Structure formats: structure tokens, C-alpha cells
Amino acid sequence: MAKHNCAICGAEVGLMSEQKLADGNYICRKECSKKTFKVFDKVAATLGDVTAHIEQIEKGTRIWNDIFVPLMKTKNKEEKLRQIYGLKDVTGYVSPSTGLMAFIEDRYKFMFFGKTTLACVYRVADLVSYEYECETSKDSEGKEVQKLTVTPRLRFTSMR
């Protein structure tokens, strides 16, 4: 079996530790592939797509830690984050006070220990369209509870 080098970090990768991209380049599963979202399709992506996605996640994670995490803890209801439901493997949050939306993926090293958060942050202006569904159900006390499910469609441009 031929060994290849990772196109991003230069590490030598073998058959079980490589991920082949659409343009024929290889990336390592141990380091570089873990820097992307799990829902990101690496098989159909090129090297440029993967590096742009990794840069976007690094920048989005910094913005998440600097702006969104303090807003999660605020007591002001107008600045509080709103969660977007309906996304499969990522959690979405909208910050009405800043005009930003974030999609995060939480990863754990073991069970609930060693949590790391990866985030992609977009402007609300990048939202092209969305579909929402309102579901009404009754809880255990007999009160009506409404759950809003939102499916956003974004114009994926990097945040500047």
C-alpha cells in the first residue's frame, strides 16, 4: 500500500488514517479531519473547501467564545440567545442584539468529560430563506407547549 502525505499538515497517512478528497488530495483523520464539522462532506470537497471550512470554524469558535458565551449567561432578555431547533447534528443560536447566528457542534472526549465546542458564525443578513413549522403539544401538566422548528438556507460566505 502506498503512503500519502496530508495536504494540510504534511503528516504521513496510511490506508486507515487517510481521507481522500474530490480533487485527489489526502487529509489525515487524526488531526485535520477532526477540525471540521461531522456533517461536512469531505468526500465531495476539494482541498480549498476543507481549508476554508477549517479557517471558518477557527474564526467562528473565537467569535463564539468572545460574544455568544457571555450572551448565554446574560439576564437581559433582549440580548439573550435564541436557539434554533430542527437542525440534525448541530445546534443553532441567533443573537438578535448583534445580528449574528452560530451553528455549534459539541464534542466530548469521554462521555460528558472534556467538552470542546466548534462553531461557524454567520451574519443574519446571509440568511437567504428559511422554513419553519410550529408544533403544539401538551405537557404533563396539561398546558399547551409550542415548539418552533426552523430549517435555514444560508449563503455560505466567510465572515469578514
For each of these PLM feature ranges, what is it?
Residues 1, 117, 147-151:
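A general secondary-structure signal for short beta-strands and their flanking turns/coil
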Residues 1-61:
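N-terminal cysteine/histidine-rich coordination modules
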Residues 18, 104-106, 132-135:
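Surface loops and adjacent helix of pleckstrin homology
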Residues 28, 101, 152-156:
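Hydrophobic beta-strand residues in large extracellular and virion-surface proteins
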Residues 30-33, 104-108, 159:
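Secondary-structure transition/turn motif
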Residues 41-111, 116:
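Anionic N-terminal interaction surfaces
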Residues 116-128:
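Short coil-to-beta-strand transition motifs
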Residues 128-160:
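Acidic, Ser/Thr- and proline-rich intrinsically disordered linker/docking segments
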